[in-house]
Structure formats: C-alpha cells, structure tokens
Design a protein with these regions (language model features):
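Bacterial N-terminal signal peptides that target proteins for export
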Residues: 1-7
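Class I SAM-dependent methyltransferase SAM/SAH-binding core
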Residues: 69, 74-127
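C-terminal motif of bacterial Sec signal peptides marking the signal peptidase cleavage site
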Residues: 14-16
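Class I SAM-dependent transferase core
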Residues: 18-69
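A short glycine-rich, Lys/Arg-flanked "PGG" loop and its adjoining helix->strand segment in the class I
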Residues: 83-84, 150-165
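Short glycine-centered segments of the SAM/dcSAM-binding site in methyltransferase folds
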Residues: 67, 91, 163-166
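A short acidic, Gly/Pro-enriched loop at the edge of an enzyme's catalytic core
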Residues: 127-137
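A short SAM/SAH-binding and catalytic strip from SAM-dependent methyltransferases
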Residues: 135-149
Length: 167
C-alpha cells in the first residue's frame, strides 16, 4: 500500500483542525453605523429655540445635586448647560472619543471657568467611565455612531448608580 494517499488524507484532515477565531461575545449591529462627521450636532440657535435642552432635562428628571455623564459631548452643548443646573453638589463629566474634540472642549470650559465639568477621553466601544458614579448618562445625537452598541452598553452599565438611567 502506498503511503501517499494516507499522507494526503491526513493533510486534508489536519488542515481543518486549526483553531477557529473566538467569536465576539457581542453581536454586530443590524443597522448602518454613521461616521463621526462633526463634533457639533447642529447650530445651537435652532436647538435652543426648540427648547431641546429643557425638554431633555424634564424628561430625564435631572435635578440639582445629580452626577451626569454627557457621553459623546462634542463641543459641550449639554455639558455647559448642565453645570449650573446640577449646582454645587452635582457634577458633570463630558466624554468624547476624539482627542482634539476633548481638548477643545476642555480649553473652552477653562476659558469659561466651568470647573464643575470634568472632561474625559473614552474609547469607541467603552466610554471608560468610573463605576457606580452617575445618576444619568446622556447619549444625545450620538448613538447612531456607535459601531458595536451591545459592547458599548455593556461597558457603560457599571458606571450607573443603583437608580441611574441612560437617556
């Protein structure tokens, strides 16, 4: 008996024995993911005249003394408006994944002396927020840009306080 067919059969069998790559524990989104076009959602005037901030604050139940994370803060539309609202006992954390946007926001906050707002750089699929820290986490005009939403939300959850919520 020739060893050639046996070796060929063994080669074919072992070729299929490579370890499969680990599948992601998170499913891919079943939707298109929008690119990050700009750190600015739209002109502030139309947002202000529509009462956007006031509506969000009311529906989210944001009160003085709360800790709020503004994820995907961009230029800080919400962050700068939340600072006086949360008052002396509250705090605001503005988070973004684009270093230049984060830096520009930090400079603007320093210039305006809004020391109530801290600025943090996050990752596309992990906002890198401290655990058990926030009463509300705002995801305003940015969720459609998240490439892996299940993973993002999984990483976001530990940062909520017991009765906290995502808006």
């Amino acid at each position: 008996m020739s060893t050639r067919p046996v070796l060929l059969a063994l080669a074919l069998l072992t070729a299929g024995c490579r370890e499969a790559p680990d599948p992601s524990p998170f499913p891919d989104p079943q939707r298109p993911v929008a690119p990050i076009v700009s750190p600015r959602y739209s002109n502030e005037d139309p947002r202000d005249s529509a009462g956007e901030f006031e509506k969000v604050v009311e529906l989210a139940g944001i009160q003085p003394g709360m800790s709020i994370a503004d994820v995907g803060a961009g230029e800080g539309y919400y962050s700068v408006r939340l600072a006086p609202l949360v008052g002396a006992k509250g705090r605001v954390l503005a988070q973004d994944i684009v270093p230049q946007t984060r830096d520009a926001l930090a400079q603007g906050l320093t210039r305006e002396r809004l020391d109530k707002v801290a600025v943090k750089l996050g990752l596309p699929n992990d906002p890198m927020l401290p655990e058990t820290s926030f009463d509300r986490i705002l995801l305003i005009h940015m969720y459609h840009e998240i490439e892996r939403p299940s993973e993002f939300l999984w990483n976001l959850r530990p940062s909520l306080k017991r009765d906290g919520s995502v808006v």
